[in-house]
Amino acid sequence: MKMLLLLCLGLTLVCVHAEEASSTGRNFNVEKINGEWHTIILASDKREKIEDNGNFRLFLEQIHVLENSLVLKFHTVRDEECSELSMVADKTEKAGEYSVTYDGFNTFTIPKTDYDNFLMAHLINEKDGETFQLMGLYGREPDLSSDIKERFAQLCEEHGILRENIIDLSNANRCLQARE
């Protein structure tokens, strides 16, 4: 009986893991990321970019999937005022990679998502001969479990982003009142 329970637990873990996808993998279904999202955590190897009044402290509201692009709707806070910002990210030649011009040239991928709860994005910005990377954890709800947040922190470390450069925004003013 114990063996059967262990087998069931093992199969459950395999199934949960198998449901996750990466935009660079064959099993990624871009249509499933369509819809409403919330910025939960931002991380960067240039922390000032995501601190208060940083140009990349953007709060994702929605992803609208088109044939070869994504329309991204964000909010930003400047002097305690919320402003809406929309941008179009186009597919690049690389599988699962998108590009967008915003404060430089940006390319990004989605290294992990389960579609229903969370999405982890990895962005590289190039401007005036300098580059930095940014990672974002986004949720279908305004907050996520500590387990998912820890997995995101580990992914950031794998990309060379230190834990002190990870900012949990779940209690920050994310312009939730500005959502339609």
From Swiss-Prot:
Tissue expression profile of the protein: Abundant in the urine of adult male mice but absent from that of females.
GO biological process: one example: positive regulation of gene expression
Keyword Cell inner membrane assigned: no
Chief location bin: secreted
GO molecular function terms noted in the UniProt entry: insulin receptor activity; odorant binding; pheromone binding; small molecule binding
The entry's keywords: Allergen, Disulfide bond, Pheromone-binding, Secreted, Signal, Transport
Location within or outside the cell: Secreted
Pfam families from the UniProt entry: Lipocalin (PF00061)
Main function: Binds pheromones that are released from drying urine of males. These pheromones affect the sexual behavior of females.
Further details from the record: There are about 15 group 1 MUP genes and their transcripts make up about 5% of male mouse liver RNA.
Protein name: Major urinary protein 6
Organism from which the protein derives: Mus musculus
